[in-house]
């Protein structure tokens, strides 16, 4: 099947992974963990991890002392419209998505993927999107005087409009194989590595049975997202869901389009190492 698949390729493209920076930066954070400790008595000072939010967030989630130093206490916490504050003595270490085999990112359009790894960012939000309860937990990070700090957490319901909401759609898409079959465009565009050229990728198509052979394990409970400033509009006609491994070379991207008010998968990219 693989031989026939590669022979039927339609196009070759340069092998460019827009997410390569985050994997490289997270890898580097793993090796620089000892360098991010900040003397308590001097307060937060910029470290090498602050140069990129991707480096910072891994260090923040991995190092308990660093997490305390980079969280504003008492931390404002909003449960819907109800405000409260978390004192430092009640704070529990938050691993964010670092204990998972992969994390996810959401975009409205492909050009927004280039913002990943931007070192000039001053404000970033890390999100947990709970599909079953239709809630979003958002962590607000700001970079001030060169230091990234967690300044607030907000838990709120997902906003919806009259059209099929992407999160509701994706929960069913990930758990219901019959529904999944109905919502995959045929033929499905497939982008993958060229086995004969390490610097190129192939674009071909998959039949429905081939999709089930190649598809990744999809998240069924919650989605993570890092909002670097990319567009994530509720009325967008397209959504891109990237699944990225942490330091293991895994990289899958799912491209969805809304047609006639309903979401469908029209392109699948597997360019992992």
How does the language model describe each region?
Residues 9-13:
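Bacterial signal peptide processing site
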